[in-house]
A protein has these predicted regions:
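Residues within mature, well-folded domains
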Residues: 1-144
Length: 144
């Protein structure tokens, strides 16, 4: 799944905290950086005695999906919808509408535990921005 290693490290931004990112990026050699990256994912492997790391696979599958479905002005993983999808996975429900007199489109994504995200396309070109909640600052566990 990982084609560009440096990009794969940058894409950790939604699951790695600042200290973890600093630790990986402070490696002196590419081999050391690769080892630290692998250790990061080994700690999150739900079945460490198998060859497959389901957490790693799921995370980068979500990034691929985000790039294919939410890209536009930037890569899908960098968009607000991409970020929410990568962190929380597929929403239980997506409500789409145009309640505004100016024709702006909204999408409301609903997840379990009454968690909702509201996106509005202010430009009319599919560039949906997260408006509620305004900040997703926690490092969430994957919603599997």
């Amino acid at each position: 799944i990982v084609i560009d290693f440096d990009k794969a490290v940058r894409q950790l931004r939604y699951v790695a905290n600042g200290d973890e990112m600093d630790f990986i990026n402070s490696a002196k050699t590419i081999d050391e950086k690769t080892k630290r990256f692998e250790q990061f994912w080994e700690k999150r492997d739900p079945t460490p005695r198998t060859t497959r790391n389901e957490a790693f696979d799921e995370y980068y599958l979500r990034i691929t999906y985000a790039n294919q479905n939410f890209g536009g002005y930037s890569e899908g993983w960098l968009t607000d919808k991409g970020m929410v999808f990568i962190i929380f996975g597929k929403p239980m429900n997506i409500e789409r509408g145009t309640p505004y007199n100016d024709g702006r489109v909204y999408e409301r994504w609903t997840y379990s535990s009454n968690r909702e995200f509201l996106f509005i396309d202010n430009s009319g070109f599919g560039d949906f921005r997260l408006v509620s909640p305004r900040l997703v600052s926690e490092k969430y566990e994957y919603n599997k």
